[in-house]
């Protein structure tokens, strides 16, 4: 009798457990990432290519069994590049149990910085956001994970110096920028380097929405007579700059754009490769389709009986999506390895980011080394050039003027 009662009790406990759903161990077989995106707002030309790249890399990882036995769940919310919607998206992601937020946009990064720190959830701002966030001691839960605007500005000066024979003394550099906080961000670096290298710096602001800059192009080419142009433009304005500088006869081989003016879409909107021939652009992810990870994604689609997505042809933005997802998942991998079988938190993923070193994804990712002190990972960019109508690699991964950047990061930290 006792035995049968014990069996009945055991079955009852099992039934209750089954009805109650999976326990913590089973539930934790999924790690949630909050993916903010813009597919319908002001920067949709980026989002509609970048976010599919992110999802495809997550699918590739999950198709191989996930990470340390856990599947990755990326929950995308389109915030239309509007800050209120971005804040709402964050709260929804937090309720879903996200241990990491993929931020999209400089104003969103600035709005979320304090919240992420209070909630101990890491957020990433690759190629945008606040440059001072490279300092992990002052911004513990913000990870640029790619070259900030300060680092991009420094590389722009180094590249101009190389292109102009190894010396900038007495040269004229034009800084053509979108007149908003992000556009103005590199100015302190450029001003410091002008004094250090002995070149003249003149700034040319382009008011939003950035679709008219004939006057600036004429001034750069015929009045100021710049020796080199560093451009930092967004949205439709990069293509306008290419067309206008070309129209006034300024050689595009003397122009280098920061990362948001260097996509296939910018070249197409300017009139195609023949118009943009010679134009240089910085990249924080590899460009082109010849990378092992992209071959794996194509193979995944083929196995499913599908054609690779059309977005893959826009290699600049699609590849950036792959890079962001890959760095995120590497941080999660490190967190899971440090806490096998346990429930990982945002703090664990933060620690996972700070252990990333030597992860290059076959060359698509630069040689990042993220630490508790350096959340940027080194400030690496490659420069590509339009040759024969296509983006072709012009430099290897590079960075510049670390002592100048360190000074500004330290000064910004002292004010925080």
PLM regions with names:
Residues 30-32, 45-52, 59, 64-136, ...:
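Beta-alpha junction/loop-to-helix N-cap segments that form part of ligand/metal-binding clefts
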Residues 245-322, 397-404, 409-412:
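Extracellular/periplasmic periplasmic-binding protein-like sensory domains
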Residues 1-32, 406-416:
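Short, low-complexity disordered leader/linker segments with a strong preference
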Residues 306-318, 329-394, 414-416:
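Segments of small-molecule ligand-sensing domains
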Residues 79, 124-125, 130-134, 209, ...:
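Venus flytrap/periplasmic-binding-protein-like
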Residues 84-85, 131-132, 140-248, 288-295:
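Extracellular/periplasmic Venus flytrap/periplasmic-binding protein
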Residues 93-106, 124-126, 172-177, 224-235, ...:
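Periplasmic-binding protein-like
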Residues 23-35, 63-71, 163-172, 343:
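Immediate post-signal peptide segment of exported/extracytoplasmic ligand-binding proteins
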């Amino acid at each position: 009798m006792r035995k049968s009662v014990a069996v009945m009790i055991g079955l009852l406990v099992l039934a209750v457990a089954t009805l109650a759903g999976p326990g913590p161990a089973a539930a934790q077989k999924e790690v949630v990432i909050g993916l903010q995106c813009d597919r319908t707002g002001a920067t949709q030309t980026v989002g509609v290519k970048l976010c599919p790249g992110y999802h495809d890399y997550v699918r590739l990882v999950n198709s191989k069994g996930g990470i340390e036995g856990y599947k990755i769940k990326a929950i995308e919310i389109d915030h239309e590049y509007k800050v209120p919607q971005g804040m709402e998206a964050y709260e929804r992601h937090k309720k879903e149990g996200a241990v990491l937020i993929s931020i999209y946009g400089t104003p969103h990064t600035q709005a979320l910085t304090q919240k992420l720190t209070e909630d101990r959830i890491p957020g990433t701002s690759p190629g945008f956001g606040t440059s001072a966030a490279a300092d992990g001691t002052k911004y513990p839960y913000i990870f640029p994970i790619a070259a900030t605007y300060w680092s991009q500005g420094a590389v722009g000066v180094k590249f101009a110096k190389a292109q102009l024979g190894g010396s900038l003394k007495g040269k004229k550099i034009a800084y053509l920028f979108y007149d908003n906080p992000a556009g103005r961000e590199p100015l302190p670096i450029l001003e410091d380097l002008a004094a250090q290298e002995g070149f003249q710096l003149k700034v040319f602001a382009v008011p939003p929405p950035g679709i008219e800059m004939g006057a600036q192009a004429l001034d750069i080419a015929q009045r100021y007579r710049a020796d080199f142009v560093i451009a930092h433009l967004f949205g439709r304005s990069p293509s306008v700059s290419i067309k206008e500088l070309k129209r006034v006869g300024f050689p595009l081989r003397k122009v280098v754009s920061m990362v948001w003016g260097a996509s296939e879409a910018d070249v197409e909107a300017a009139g195609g490769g023949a118009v943009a021939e010679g134009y240089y652009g910085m990249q924080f992810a590899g460009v082109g389709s010849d990378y092992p990870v992209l071959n794996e994604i194509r193979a995944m689609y083929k196995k499913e009986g599908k054609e690779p997505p059309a977005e893959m042809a826009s290699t600049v933005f699609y590849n950036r999506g792959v890079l962001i997802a890959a760095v995120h998942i590497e941080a999660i991998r490190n967190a899971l390895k440090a806490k096998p079988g346990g429930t990982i938190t945002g703090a664990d993923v933060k620690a996972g980011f700070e252990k990333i070193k030597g992860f290059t994804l076959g060359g698509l990712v630069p040689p990042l080394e993220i630490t508790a002190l350096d959340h940027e990972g080194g400030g690496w960019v490659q420069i590509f050039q339009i040759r024969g109508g296509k983006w072709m690699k012009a430099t290897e991964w590079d960075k510049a003027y670390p002592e100048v950047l360190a000074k500004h990061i330290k000064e910004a930290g002292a004010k925080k």
